């Protein structure tokens, strides 16, 4: 008999309280059928953990379980005392976001090397579970092989498809000596003058110590293709549920697990499965709405009949044959229900999977995602202090401290995604470089009002460093010529870099002790005429009018038209002649006579003072 979701969850919690723990397999078996979203599964696991029930990969030993039971009350009391003391000491003291963030961050314990490996394994297990689920979706393997064919045809890059391969036979090498050396190197570099950070790792391939071997990739993809063909043929011949087919599917999953896909490609495959599941949900909800809400068919009866017969109309015919009050109403929605069933059949044909198998694959994929996401969250929260310690060294660079922390956290999350515990280094040694890269990149992109490209930032940092060295050597600031000689660069490029390196300054910057005037008040407006020039022009205009007033009206008008005084333009002799209906020669004579009058000392003296020396 089908149990409702509440009773299934209650049974799961009861079992967990009896055992003191739950495994992921038990959670998967007891989850309701309609819960397939990774966020929902993660919320349920979080709720179970909050109840004091640990969710583990596998059942613990009896001795470990007894020890955990004996110390549970003591641990709870100690944890409660720590929380109470921290609350009493901090309550009412501050609402500063940074302090509140640090206070909450301080409640998370630091990880040991073994703890880091344990979390990294959980992340890997979660991702492997997702990949194994995706491997059962034929279209996913087909897509991956098609993308590799594009790589072989030189239409795409191999690095855009995979980041490497996981060796299933590789042993864990803790390499304690290498860990200490790496830690010392990273700390030593962090203590250096931060101006020398020339954007460590310009691209996002800071962890790609070795490029992907094309021959190895060709061999791995050939193995994947061969196993895919065998699996596909076996399923066609014997059916997916046959033991041989299941064995071949398992082999295909093991081969597919060895591929470390680029996040973009991995997300595409996962999303394609999720889109397929959304299509199934849409049709199932439509059918349930028609039968349960519209025809008033009891939900319990619908679930009993529909589950397991998603693409067959036998359940619908059986429901009509039950001769219940709602059975007659089903005839009215028969056409719409059959249309939805046809769409579900179409999904089965597209995927080569039954609806039940699509749900099962999506369910296991969601649990794997939730498991990996939870482990990543633990790793990030345990290393937030590292981000703070690095961000402190980049203050006063143009970004607020909280912004630096957030950018560093983004780098930390990227480091968690790319961390490989098998290389033997501590996570903090590896994450340092991702955090520094994220912070320095954000400063280069956001700190300045006018963004400067990263390569130019590097040149400016190098110029500043050499400039300081030369200042110490010579006791004075070096000239552009000296900098050009030392840096082996053209002098004009040095001057250009020096000009670009200048920081913008606000027009509202106060000037003087009283701060009643601003920098903008002292900047010349080149678009307007100077007050002196404006006054001179106005005086010249008035003097010209006075002088022309001493001439006859005809002479004054001829001069105004010839020289464009108080007019938009000047006129030729021909144009002026037409205005007065006389010849151009006569206009020339009138103009000459008027100018002779103006040259008289009594009139010219007024205008002579405006001539430039």
Curated annotation (Swiss-Prot):
Q: Which GO terms describe its biological process?
A: DNA-templated transcription initiation; negative regulation of DNA-templated transcription; regulation of DNA-templated transcription initiation; response to heat
Q: Where is this motif: Interaction with polymerase core subunit RpoC?
A: 403-406
What InterPro entries does the annotation carry? RNA_pol_sigma-70_dom, RNA_pol_sigma70, RNA_pol_sigma70_r1_2, RNA_pol_sigma70_r2, RNA_pol_sigma70_r3, RNA_pol_sigma70_r4, RNA_pol_sigma_70_non-ess, RNA_pol_sigma_70_r1_1
Location of the region described as Sigma-70 factor domain-1 in the Swiss-Prot/TrEMBL record: 2-80
Q: Where in the cell is it found?
A: Cytoplasm
| Keywords from the named record | Cytoplasm, DNA-binding, Sigma factor, Transcription, Transcription regulation
**What's the main place this protein lives?**
cytoplasm
What are the DNA-binding region positions? Answer: 573-592
The record's Pfam families line, in alphabetical order, gives: Sigma70_ner, Sigma70_r1_1, Sigma70_r1_2, Sigma70_r2, Sigma70_r3, Sigma70_r4
Any notes on this protein's domains? Contains 4 domains, connected by flexible linkers. In the active conformation, the domains are in an extended conformation, each making extensive interactions with the RNA polymerase catalytic core.
Spell out the protein name for this chain.
Answer: RNA polymerase sigma factor RpoD
User: What species is this protein from?
Assistant: Escherichia coli (strain K12)
- Gene assigned in the entry: rpoD
């Amino acid at each position: 008999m089908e149990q409702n979701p509440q009773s299934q969850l209650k049974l799961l919690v009861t079992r967990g309280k009896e055992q003191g723990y739950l495994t992921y397999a038990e959670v998967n078996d007891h989850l309701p059928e309609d819960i397939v979203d990774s966020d929902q599964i993660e919320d349920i696991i979080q709720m179970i953990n909050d109840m004091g029930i640990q969710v583990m990969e596998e059942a613990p030993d009896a001795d470990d379980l007894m020890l955990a039971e004996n110390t549970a009350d003591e641990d709870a009391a100690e944890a409660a005392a720590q929380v109470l003391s921290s609350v009493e000491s901090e309550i009412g003291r501050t609402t500063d976001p940074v302090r509140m963030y640090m206070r909450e961050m301080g409640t998370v314990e630091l990880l040991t090397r073994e703890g880091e490996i344990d979390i990294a394994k959980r992340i890997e297990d979660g991702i492997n579970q997702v990949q194994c689920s995706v491997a059962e979706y034929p279209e996913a393997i087909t897509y991956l092989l098609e993308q590799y064919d594009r790589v072989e045809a030189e239409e795409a890059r191999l690095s855009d498809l995979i980041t490497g391969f996981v060796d299933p036979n590789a042993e864990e090498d803790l390499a304690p000596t290498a860990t200490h050396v790496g830690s010392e190197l990273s700390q030593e570099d962090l203590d250096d003058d931060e101006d020398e950070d020339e954007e460590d790792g310009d691209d996002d391939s800071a962890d790609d110590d070795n490029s992907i071997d094309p021959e190895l990739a060709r061999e791995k993809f050939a193995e994947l293709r061969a196993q895919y063909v065998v699996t596909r043929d076996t399923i066609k011949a014997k059916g997916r549920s046959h033991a041989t087919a299941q064995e071949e599917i398992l082999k295909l999953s093991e081969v597919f697990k060895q591929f470390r896909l680029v996040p973009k490609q991995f997300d595409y495959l996962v999303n394609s499965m999720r889109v397929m599941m959304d299509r199934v949900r849409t049709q199932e909800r439509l059918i349930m709405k028609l039968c349960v809400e519209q025809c008033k068919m009891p939900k319990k009866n619908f679930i009993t009949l529909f589950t397991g017969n998603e693409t067959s109309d036998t359940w619908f015919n059986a429901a009509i044959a039950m001769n219940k009050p709602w059975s007659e109403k089903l005839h009215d929605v028969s056409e719409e229900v059959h249309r939805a069933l046809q769409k579900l059949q179409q999904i089965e044909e597209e995927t080569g999977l039954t609806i039940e198998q699509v749900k099962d694959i999506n369910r296991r994929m969601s649990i794997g995602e939730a498991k990996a996401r939870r482990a990543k969250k633990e790793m990030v929260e345990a290393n937030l202090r590292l981000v703070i310690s690095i961000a402190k060294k980049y203050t006063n660079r143009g970004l607020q401290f909280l912004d630096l922390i957030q950018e560093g956290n983004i780098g930390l999350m990227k480091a968690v995604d790319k961390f490989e515990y098998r290389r033997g280094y501590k996570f903090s040694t590896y994450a340092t470089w991702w955090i520094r890269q994220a912070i320095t990149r954000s400063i280069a992109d956001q700190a300045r009002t006018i963004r400067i490209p990263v390569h130019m930032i590097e040149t400016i940092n190098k110029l500043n460093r050499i400039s300081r060295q030369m200042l110490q050597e010579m006791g004075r600031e070096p000239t552009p010529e000296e900098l050009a000689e030392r840096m082996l660069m053209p002098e004009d490029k040095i001057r250009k870099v020096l000009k670009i390196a200048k920081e913008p300054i606000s027009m509202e910057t106060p000037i003087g002790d009283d701060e009643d005037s601003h920098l903008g008040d002292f900047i010349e407006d080149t678009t307007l005429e100077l007050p002196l020039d404006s006054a001179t022009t106005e005086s010249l205009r008035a003097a010209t009018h006075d002088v022309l007033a001493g001439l006859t009206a005809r002479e004054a008008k001829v001069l105004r038209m010839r020289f464009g005084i108080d007019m938009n333009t000047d006129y030729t002799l021909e144009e002026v002649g037409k205005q007065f209906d006389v010849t151009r020669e006569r206009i020339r004579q009138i103009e000459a006579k008027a100018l002779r009058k103006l040259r008289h000392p009594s009139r010219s003296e007024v205008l002579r003072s405006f001539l430039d020396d």
